[in-house]
UniProtKB/Swiss-Prot annotation:
Its EC number is 3.5.1.52. It holds the Pfam family Transglut_core. Keywords: Cytoplasm, Hydrolase, Metal-binding, Zinc. The keyword Cytoplasm applies. This is Peptide-N(4)-(N-acetyl-beta-glucosaminyl)asparagine amidase. It comes from Oryza sativa subsp. japonica. The keyword Nucleotidyltransferase does not apply. Belongs to the transglutaminase-like superfamily. PNGase family. One of its GO terms (cellular component) is cytosol. The active site is at C267 (nucleophile), H294, D311. Its cofactor is Zn(2+). The gene is PNG1. GO terms for molecular function: metal ion binding; peptide-N4-(N-acetyl-beta-glucosaminyl)asparagine amidase activity. Zn(2+) binds at C209, C212, C241, C244. Specifically deglycosylates the denatured form of N-linked glycoproteins in the cytoplasm and assists their proteasome-mediated degradation. Cleaves the beta-aspartyl-glucosamine (GlcNAc) of the glycan and the amide side chain of Asn, converting Asn to Asp. Prefers proteins containing high-mannose over those bearing complex type oligosaccharides. Can recognize misfolded proteins in the endoplasmic reticulum that are exported to the cytosol to be destroyed and deglycosylate them, while it has no activity toward native proteins.
Length: 447
């Protein structure tokens, strides 16, 4: 932490005539560049997003990578002009176009997809899709619990709303947004809810001993007690203490109301409870089931006009390639589940669709679509015509988005992290498992 005094020159010497104005800024380098921009804004009325700060001594541009402790005190402020904004927008548009596959590469991908579909016919299991249905439909009961007004009120009472709202507004102000729209405020609050949840929920590899608080090891499964079954814990893991040999129970609760109390678990409990929180604050939210070994959340962003990925275990948002590119996961089925039905959203999370197709062997693609449509139709049957039309229009827009997503180029310059949640031992075990993540079905509970 270093206290600095900068002299910021504004105007003059730029061909526009007039004397340069000088402003002195007292600044603590610990606070970061965003705070410096806000201080300059208070003196010059140039919004942070339109500021270009240049070191007068060498002409270098001050950015997030600049060592603010080492530069000279003389700074020059240049307001970005409309022409520069247009140039930046044009460059961004060109970069977006460059992301799309070349015609030749796209043709290769489509051919590989057709070949994968052909081979899939010889690999799929001929059970009429019953296994697939059994892995998806039970989760509808799970997500419908999120709609209980009493549960939602209990959830809201556990959240420091005033604190998160303040943090949301501060985050917007740091971006130069001092008069945010409702959609912008809602979006910022959602991100603060994610960050808060990440800090307030506890990951469990092996629970501490109930008797002495020391480390335990798994010794198998136990029979659920009536008090545990009441809150959906059909599976109970049993652990023995390394020191006092006492046993500790770890019920895998499914009722999000109970998770408000326990505030612990693995990815199943984390995603279950966080999706419930999102619904409790009025966000359109879906539980996302990855058939390999993970669960997370999606919320519909009115700000972006699309569904947005959020992973409470990792504290990550809007980064759907995290699993394939960062974790090196071999995805097969990624299914979104909400009160309004179920959707296959696998294409959002892959840029290797033809490879994913080769692993989708539970049933045919037509059967997958038919089962999902059947489940969705069942849970939308009571909707009004207007409500149904709105959902169908949103589904259509999402289908178009997903169709394009699988053929977009991966930005190789972006490095995504591997999995952070869970111990190394647990992560290794998890990679060997492909069970149902929440304990509403049978399985050994890798998730």
């Amino acid at each position: 932490m270093v206290a600095r005094r900068f002299v910021v020159r504004q105007g003059g010497g730029g061909g526009g005539g007039g004397e340069a104005e000088e402003h002195e800024v007292e600044y603590d380098t610990e606070h970061g560049l965003d705070i410096l921009r806000l201080q300059i804004f208070s003196l010059t009325s140039v919004p942070p997003e339109l500021q270009k700060i240049v070191v007068e001594a060498d002409g270098s541009v001050v950015d997030d990578g600049t060592d603010l402790e080492a530069i000279s005190e003389g700074l020059r402020l240049v307001a970005i002009t409309g022409e520069e904004e247009e140039a930046e927008a044009a460059a961004a548009a060109e970069a977006a176009r460059a992301q799309e596959k070349s015609d030749e590469e796209l043709a290769r991908m489509i051919q590989a997809e057709e070949e994968a579909l052909l081979l899939q016919q010889y690999s799929i299991r001929n059970d009429g899709g019953e296994e697939f249905r059994e892995r998806v439909e039970p989760y509808m009961h799970q997500v419908l619990m999120y709609e209980d007004p009493m549960r939602q009120e209990a959830a809201r009472k556990t959240v420091p709303m005033d604190e998160l709202q303040e943090k949301a507004l501060v985050s917007l102000a740091k971006e130069g947004n001092f008069s945010p729209s409702k959609d912008e405020e809602d979006h910022a609050f959602l991100l603060q809810l994610l960050f808060w949840f990440k800090q307030s929920f506890r990951w469990v590899n092996a629970p501490p001993c109930d008797s002495c608080g020391r480390e335990t090891f798994n010794v198998g499964m136990g029979t659920a007690l009536p008090s545990e079954i009441k809150f959906g814990a059909n599976r109970v893991e049993i652990y023995r203490c390394n020191y006092c040999s006492s046993t500790t129970r770890f019920p895998r609760y499914n009722d999000p109301y109970k998770l408000l109390e326990t505030r612990k678990g693995r990815c199943g409990e984390w995603a279950n409870c966080f999706t419930f929180y999102c619904r409790s604050f009025g966000y359109e939210a879906r539980l996302i089931l990855d058939f390999t070994d993970h669960v997370w959340t999606e919320c519909f962003s009115n700000l972006y006009g699309r569904w947005m990925h959020l992973d409470p275990c990792e504290g990550v948002y809007d980064n759907p390639l995290l699993y394939e590119k960062g974790w090196n996961k071999k995805l097969d089925y990624v299914i979104a589940i909400s009160k309004d039905g179920v959707r296959d959203v696998t294409k959002r999370y892959t840029r290797k669709w033809h490879e994913v197709l080769s692993r989708r062997i539970i049933t045919s693609e037509d059967t997958v679509s038919a089962i999902l449509s059947s489940i969705t139709g069942k849970y939308r049957s009571g909707l009004s015509i207007d409500g149904l039309t709105a959902l169908e229009n949103r589904d259509k827009k999402e289908s178009e988005e997903l169709s394009k997503a699988a053929y977009l180029e991966v930005d190789t310059s972006i490095s995504l992290p591997g999995r952070q949640s869970g111990s190394v031992e647990w992560r290794k075990a998890s990679q060997k498992c492909s069970t149902y993540i929440l304990s509403i079905t049978s399985g050994n509970g890798c998730g």
